[in-house]
């Protein structure tokens, strides 16, 4: 009988321990919070970082077709500010770049939106985001210091690497270049995607 009591006591203990563990989890607010956190994290791991379909549609407009190469006067460039035209173009050091894929930076609400549709050379070379630093006519940049010219050259390199070069900024009275449809930069694979 003593062996039966010990066996019965052992069975009762294991039943109490398993029932006690569940009871402890569901009766303690801290344990419920931790259990909920574990379930949430497990859900996020299994589900992954999939954006909701409605969020991605609102943030990103459909990509625009590639702009054919052409040259722009400062007045023609002004139209491509992301407001009048969905495409955003900027001129840097006499080169015009399509920065539409960088809309978050260069769009109307972006931190560099003042440069959209403009020659941004002087503003980038002098680190000035004021509209007063930008000129409405062609800016020959002859008054930039050597340090500012080097800064501008660095910006030019970055934009050449990252964005599509669509043409050049024309001086007053300068004739536009006639580009062939086949003329493209040599190595498109080196251009970085956003």
Curated annotation (Swiss-Prot):
User: Which residues lie within the region annotated Disordered?
Assistant: 50-70, 174-194
Write down which residues bear the modification named Phosphothreonine: 73
Q: Which domain of life is it from?
A: Eukaryota
- Gene3D superfamilies tied to this protein: Cytochrome b5-like heme/steroid binding domain
Report the GO molecular function annotations.
heme binding; metal ion binding; protein homodimerization activity; steroid binding
Q: Which GO terms describe its biological process?
A: heme biosynthetic process; meiotic cell cycle process involved in oocyte maturation; positive regulation of lipoprotein transport
Domain Cytochrome b5 heme-binding: residue ranges: 71-170
Q: What is this protein called?
A: Membrane-associated progesterone receptor component 1
Query: What organism is listed for this UniProt entry?
Result: Bos taurus
């Amino acid at each position: 009988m003593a062996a039966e009591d010990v066996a019965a006591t052992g069975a009762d203990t294991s039943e109490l321990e398993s029932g006690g563990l569940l009871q402890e989890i569901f009766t303690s607010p801290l344990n419920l919070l931790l259990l909920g956190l574990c379930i949430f994290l497990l859900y996020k791991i299994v589900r992954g970082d999939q954006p909701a379909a409605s969020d991605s549609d609102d943030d990103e407009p459909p990509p625009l077709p590639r702009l054919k190469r052409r040259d722009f006067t400062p007045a023609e460039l002004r139209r491509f500010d992301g407001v009048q035209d969905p495409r955003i173009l900027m001129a840097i050091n006499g080169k015009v770049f399509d920065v539409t894929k960088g809309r978050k930076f260069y769009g109307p609400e972006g931190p560099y939106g003042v440069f959209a549709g403009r020659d941004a050379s002087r503003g980038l070379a002098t680190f000035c985001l004021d509209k007063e630093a930008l000129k409405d006519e062609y800016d020959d940049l002859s008054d930039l210091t050597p340090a500012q010219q080097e800064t501008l050259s660095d910006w030019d390199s970055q934009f050449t690497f990252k964005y599509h070069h669509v043409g050049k900024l024309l001086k007053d009275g300068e004739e536009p270049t006639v580009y062939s449809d086949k003329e493209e930069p040599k190595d498109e694979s080196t251009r970085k995607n956003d």
